[in-house]
C-alpha cells in the first residue's frame, strides 16, 4: 500500500519502505498535485504549465516527462509500479483512486464530511469523536515549506476547515459542561491564529463558567493587545460589551448562562473527568451564591439598623 502524508512537512512510503526526499523534489510535487486533484484528470499541457509555466510548451512537456520517469524509477526502487497509481496517456494524467493507497488529507475530509453543516452544540458524542480523529491527523499545515501557488489555496482551505472543526469541538465541550476541555481547544485555535476574536470571547465565557471571572477579564486584555499589535484595531462591540458586563458583574452567573434543551445524561454514561469537572463547577457556583447572599444579608441588616436608629 502507498501511504502518503501531506500535512506538516509530509512523507510517503510503500508499505514499510520510505520514499526518500518526499515531497521536496519537483517530481514528488507533481504527485502531490495529482493526489490533491485525485478526482479529476489533468490535461498534460496544463499540468506542465503549472510547474514549468516560464518555459515554452515543448520544454515544459519535456520536464513533465522527466518527472514521470523519475516517479517511475522511485516507485520501482521501493517495489511499486507507477501504473498502479497513475493513469498516463498522451493527453492527460490522473491519480488512480482504485489502487491501494492511504492519504491523510482524504481521510481528514471524509471524517469531517458528515458534520460539515452542523454547529458545535448539535454534535452527538460519536460525531465529536469522529471530529477529534480528523483533527489528530492535522499535525501541521499542508506541505509546509512548499510555496507553490497551487499549494497555497489548498493549504488555506484545509486550514480553515481544521480551525472551524476545533471551534465546533470547543462549543461542543462547553455545551456538555466540559469547560476545561473547551478551553484547551480554544488554545489550540489561537496557536494557529491568535487574532480570532470570536475564540477569545468564547474563552472568556468558558473561564466565567468555571468560576474564574478574573481569568475571563485577563483573556479580554490578551485579545485587546493582540488585535492592537498585529492588526491595528480594537476589539469589536460584541467583545467590549461582554467585557463590560463581566467587569461590572452584570453578566449572568454560571447557573443562569447555561441553558440546555438536552435531557440529563444517565450518570452511568458520564465519565469520571466529566463528573468531576461538573462537580467543581457546582462548588464554584455555590460559593458565589453564598458570598452574594452574605452581601445581601449585610445590606438588609444595615437597613434595619438605620430604621431602628430613626425610630428611636
Task: Show where each model-derived region lies.
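DNA-binding patch around the recognition helix
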Residues: 1-5, 66-98, 225-237
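Short boundary/linker motifs that mark transitions into or out of structured domains
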Residues: 1-30, 84-92, 104, 140, ...
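Short amphipathic alpha-helical recognition elements used for nucleic-acid or partner binding
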Residues: 20-51, 71, 198-200
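DNA-recognition element of transcription regulators
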Residues: 23-32, 57-79
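Conserved amphipathic alpha-helical interaction elements at protein-protein interfaces in regulatory
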Residues: 36-37, 53, 77, 229
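Ca2+-coordinating acidic residues in Ca2+-binding motifs
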Residues: 46, 63, 107
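Intrinsically disordered, charged and Pro/Gly-enriched terminal/linker segments
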Residues: 56-57, 92-312
Amino acid at each position: 500500500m502507498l501511504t502518503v502524508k501531506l500535512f506538516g512537512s509530509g512523507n510517503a512510503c510503500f508499505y514499510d519502505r520510505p520514499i526518500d526526499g518526499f515531497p521536496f523534489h519537483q517530481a514528488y510535487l507533481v504527485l502531490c498535485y495529482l493526489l490533491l486533484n485525485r478526482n479529476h484528470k489533468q490535461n498534460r499541457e496544463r499540468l506542465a504549465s503549472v510547474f514549468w509555466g516560464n518555459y515554452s510548451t515543448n520544454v515544459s512537456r519535456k520536464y513533465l516527462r522527466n518527472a514521470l520517469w523519475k516517479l517511475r524509477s522511485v516507485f520501482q526502487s521501493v517495489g511499486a509500479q507507477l501504473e498502479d497509481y497513475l493513469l498516463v496517456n498522451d493527453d492527460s494524467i490522473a491519480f488512480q483512486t482504485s489502487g491501494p493507497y492511504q492519504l491523510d488529507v482524504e481521510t481528514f475530509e471524509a471524517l469531517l464530511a458528515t458534520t460539515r453543516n452542523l454547529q458545535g452544540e448539535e454534535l452527538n458524542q460519536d460525531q465529536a469523536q469522529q471530529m477529534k480523529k480528523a483533527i489528530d491527523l492535522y499535525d501541521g499545515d499542508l506541505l509546509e515549506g512548499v510555496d507553490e501557488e497551487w499549494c497555497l489555496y489548498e493549504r488555506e482551505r484545509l486550514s480553515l476547515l481544521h480551525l472551524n472543526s476545533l471551534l465546533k469541538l470547543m462549543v461542543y465541550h462547553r455545551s456538555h459542561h466540559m469547560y476545561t476541555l473547551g478551553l484547551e481547544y480554544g488554545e489550540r485555535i489561537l496557536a494557529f491564529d491568535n487574532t480570532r476574536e470570536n475564540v477569545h470571547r468564547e474563552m472568556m465565557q468558558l473561564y466565567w463558567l468555571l468560576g474564574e471571572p478574573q481569568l475571563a477579564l485577563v483573556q479580554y486584555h490578551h485579545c485587546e493587545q493582540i488585535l492592537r499589535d498585529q492588526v491595528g484595531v480594537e476589539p469589536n462591540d460584541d467583545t467590549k460589551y461582554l467585557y463590560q458586563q463581566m467587569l461590572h458583574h452584570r453578566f449572568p452567573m454560571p447557573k443562569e448562562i447555561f441553558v440546555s434543551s438536552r435531557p440529563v445524561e444517565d450518570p452511568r454514561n458520564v465519565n469520571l473527568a466529566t463528573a468531576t469537572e461538573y462537580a467543581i463547577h457546582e462548588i464554584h457556583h455555590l460559593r458565589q451564591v453564598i458570598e452574594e447572599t452574605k452581601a445581601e444579608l449585610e445590606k438588609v441588616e444595615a437597613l434595619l439598623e438605620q430604621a431602628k436608629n430613626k425610630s428611636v
